[in-house]
Every structure is written in structure tokens, then in C-alpha cells.
UniProtKB/Swiss-Prot annotation:
PROSITE patterns: PHOSPHOFRUCTOKINASE (PS00433)
Tagged with keyword Phosphoprotein: no
Binding site for ADP: R21, A22, V23, V24, R25, R154, G185, A186, D187, K211, K213, K214, H215
Catalytic residues (UniProt): D127
Record GO terms (molecular function): 6-phosphofructokinase activity; AMP binding; ATP binding; fructose-6-phosphate binding; identical protein binding; metal ion binding; monosaccharide binding
Binding-site residues, substrate: T125, I126, D127, R162, M169, G170, R171, E222, R244, H250, I251, Q252, R253
Species per Swiss-Prot/TrEMBL record: Streptococcus suis (strain 05ZYH33)
Cofactor(s) needed for function: Mg(2+)
InterPro entries according to UniProt: ATP_PFK, ATP_PFK_prok-type, PFKA_ATP_prok, Phosphofructokinase_CS, Phosphofructokinase_dom, PKF_sf
Name by which UniProt lists this protein: ATP-dependent 6-phosphofructokinase
Domain of life according to the entry: Bacteria
Alphabetically ordered keywords of this record: Allosteric enzyme, ATP-binding, Cytoplasm, Glycolysis, Kinase, Magnesium, Metal-binding, Nucleotide-binding, Transferase
């Protein structure tokens, strides 16, 4: 394989630039040419493709976001969109593609491989909800950003003896809430993976004030419900504290990536190139117990594949990701 391309797709995540840099420089070290595709699959279909050099990716390792830009492009799920994208790849002489993004991006990589263009998925999302890997690119930075924000909220919360409900991102996963909540000493963490009783939350907050606490922090994963609605339910259940709501929002997707995300992205990007060099495709890279691994994107659960097809052609997730609820138990023991 002599010429490959790299793209970022879906929501951006800190560390994507570090992954792009690793793909480009590892490929050049392997004697390959590298092309960048702007704005994900939309750019592929539009032919927005250009050659990258080692200098093209200089000084981007510390930058958040993705300098190739990203976009959601549902049209690529259709055969017509895939064929248009493949036409552009052929036009530029591209033989393989590295796709950095979430599970939707992986589906596109799988389709490219089926059409004869080996593609490797690299997990880039702050949500940490991709199967086949312990951690995704961007998660550590998002947790650090959320922790820093909660630390600041704690300052004002304690000054006014208030209860704060802090909503963090994560889509349907509670990883950011759990990690940021524990790191910031939250009193209560509420995640989608665990049932909760609103009356128990009220009792826990009241018990804290009765023990002499001056404030309370509740970290809420966005996949549970909006923070404003959660606050209303707290009041309806009898909470009498001075309650405030903060939604951290997209600040969690920005900012300079942490050292861990930079190193993780560099390792994953380089590993993806090595797989393409071997002519392999239809795989997603990941990290398990600090070691690089790869899994088939599509297949059976027994084969270790991330996704499988039902008899009616629908894509389903094998062994869906769930946040580590041992962390939830840990927080309940520590937040007394």
C-alpha cells in the first residue's frame, strides 16, 4: 500500500489532531503518501482531498478539535453516497483510509472495506462509549475539563451554602460523570447505567447538610435527563436547599488535550497505519490493559467483532459499553 488517507468524522474530541499527526508521520516513515480528507465523509464525497506532509501536521499535537474539520454525513449510510466517496478515492489513487471518530464513523469504515478499500477505525469521542477499547481519544481531556469546572463551582457553592446540579456530557454513557464526579468529590453522581430514586438523592443531600456540610454537588450525566428537569424533580420530592443548575456543555469537547490523550492518540494513529501497511481493513484499534489491540468492526460477538448484522440487515452492538459501576459504589463510600 503506497497511498492512504485520513479523516475525522462525527463530534470532535481533543486529541484528534495528535492522531492525525501520528497517522501522517508514521505513514511517511513507512514510505507511504498521505492525504487528508476535510469534513469527514462529506468531504470524501465532495472530493475535498489534499496531500499532507510531515510539516502539514507540525505544531498541531497541542491543539484541540481537528484541523481537518469534521461533519456528520448520514448520506454515507446509503449505497449512493458510498459509491460517490469511493469514486473520489480512486480518482486520488488512495488505497486505504484511517477513520477517526465514533461508532457511526466505524460503520462508514466498514462499508469502505466491503467495497475493497481497507479502512481502520480509531476511537475518537469524549463519551468513552466505544466497545473494544478501555479508553477513547478525548475522554481524559473532557474529564479534566469537567473536573476543573466542578472545582470552580464548588468554590461558589460553598460560599453561599448552595446545592449545584452539574450536567456533564457523555451521550448515553456515564463515564464522564463518574470520573469527573469522583475526581471533584461530588456528593451524588447520577448515571444512565444505574437506576436511581429521587427521594434517595434528596435524603442524601439533606443528610449531608445535617452533618455540617456547607454545600452539595450533584454530577448528572446528560443521558439521564436535563439538569433543569432533574432540579424540578428534586424540589417536587422535598428538597429545601438553595438549588442551582449548571450545564457544562460543549466546553468539554474543546481545549488542549491532556498528556494521556496525546500519547493515546499517537499510539492509536500509528497502530492504524501499521495495520493498513499489512493490507488489513475492517478493523478498529483500541487499548486494553495499556496494550494496542484491534477488533473486527463487523462480525460475531464470538469473533470479538464490535458490531453484527441481524437477519433483517440492522447493525447492532455486540457487548454494548457500560460505565464501571464499581466507581459509583466507590463514590457513595467516599462522599459521606
Amino acid at each position: 500500500m503506497k497511498r492512504i488517507a485520513v479523516l475525522t468524522s462525527g463530534g470532535d474530541a481533543p486529541g484528534m489532531n495528535a492522531a492525525i499527526r501520528a497517522v501522517v508521520r508514521q505513514a511517511i516513515s513507512e514510505g507511504m503518501e498521505v492525504y487528508g480528507i476535510n469534513e469527514g465523509y462529506a468531504g470524501m464525497v465532495a472530493g475535498d482531498i489534499h496531500e499532507l506532509s510531515a510539516r502539514s501536521v507540525g505544531d498541531i499535537i497541542s491543539r484541540g478539535g481537528t484541523f481537518l474539520c469534521s461533519a456528520r454525513y448520514p448520506e454515507f449510510a446509503k449505497l449512493e453516497g458510498q459509491l460517490k466517496g469511493i469514486e473520489q478515492l480512486k480518482k486520488h489513487g488512495i488505497e486505504g483510509v484511517v477513520v477517526i471518530g465514533g461508532d457511526g464513523s466505524y460503520h462508514g469504515a466498514m462499508r469502505l472495506t466491503e467495497h475493497g478499500f481497507p479502512a481502520i477505525g480509531v476511537p475518537g469521542t469524549i463519551d468513552n462509549d466505544i466497545v473494544g477499547t478501555d479508553f477513547t481519544i478525548g475522554f481524559d481531556t473532557a474529564v479534566t475539563t469537567a473536573m476543573d469546572a466542578i472545582d470552580k463551582i464548588r468554590d461558589t457553592s460553598s460560599s453561599h451554602r448552595r446545592t449545584f446540579v452539574v450536567e456533564v456530557m457523555g451521550r448515553h454513557a456515564g463515564d464522564i460523570a463518574l470520573w469527573a464526579g469522583i475526581a471533584s468529590g461530588a456528593d451524588v453522581i447520577v448515571v444512565p447505567e444505574e437506576d436511581f430514586n429521587i427521594n434517595d438523592v434528596v435524603d442524601r443531600i439533606k443528610a449531608g447538610y445535617d452533618k455540617g456540610k456547607k454545600h452539595s454537588i450533584i454530577v448528572l450525566a446528560e443521558g439521564v435527563m436535563p439538569a433543569a428537569q432533574f432540579a424540578e424533580e428534586l424540589k417536587a420530592a422535598g428538597d429545601t436547599s438553595d438549588l442551582r443548575v449548571t450545564e457544562l456543555g460543549h466546553i468539554q469537547r474543546g481545549g488542549s488535550p491532556t498528556a494521556r490523550d496525546r500519547v493515546l492518540a499517537s499510539r492509536m494513529g500509528a497502530h492504524a497505519v501499521k495495520l493498513l501497511k499489512e493490507g488489513r481493513g475492517g478493523l478498529a484499534v483500541g487499548i486494553r490493559n495499556e496494550q494496542m489491540v484491534e477488533n473486527p468492526i463487523l462480525g460475531t460477538a464470538e469473533e470479538g467483532a464490535l458490531f453484527s448484522l441481524t437477519t433483517d440487515g440492522k447493525i447492532v452492538v455486540n457487548n454494548p459499553h457500560k460505565a464501571d459501576l464499581e466507581l459509583a459504589d466507590l463514590n457513595r463510600n467516599l462522599s459521606i
